[in-house]
Amino acid sequence: MTDTLPRRPLLTGWTGRAAVAALALFIIARGLAYAGPAAPAGAPSILGVIDSVAPTWLWGIVYITAGLLVVAGTWWQRLWTTGLILWAIAQSVWIVGYVVATVTGLAPRGWVTAAAIGPGLALAFLLLYLGPPPEGDEDG
């Protein structure tokens, strides 16, 4: 008996590909939200913490790229994994940003958003552990 879960594909066939595509659309939508105009100068915002790492428009590009990689990954496994890792890295930076904003008083309830992002990040790691949809699997 083993102490760990067996490594096997979580998503198979078109059903799995549809689930991955839905996740990708969410990631792309978040990227599009950040690609818009910046917040007015002097407006207190969590984005001030995140903007110290990279400008908001760049975060938009990162999220859109991750989402497109996940979409492409429904057919090419390596891209699926790369997209999820890129998304997980971006999400981790935003979690840290919200925690820093909470500690510094910029966003006293920022920890709530950080905690809300956490389950998505946990899902990404679970998907990475269990594996991408198998290549050539057309059964649904």
Model-assigned labels for residue ranges:
Residues R78, I85, S92-A114:
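Membrane-helix boundary connector in multi-pass membrane proteins
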Residues G67-T82:
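Juxtamembrane helix-break-helix junctions at the cytosolic face
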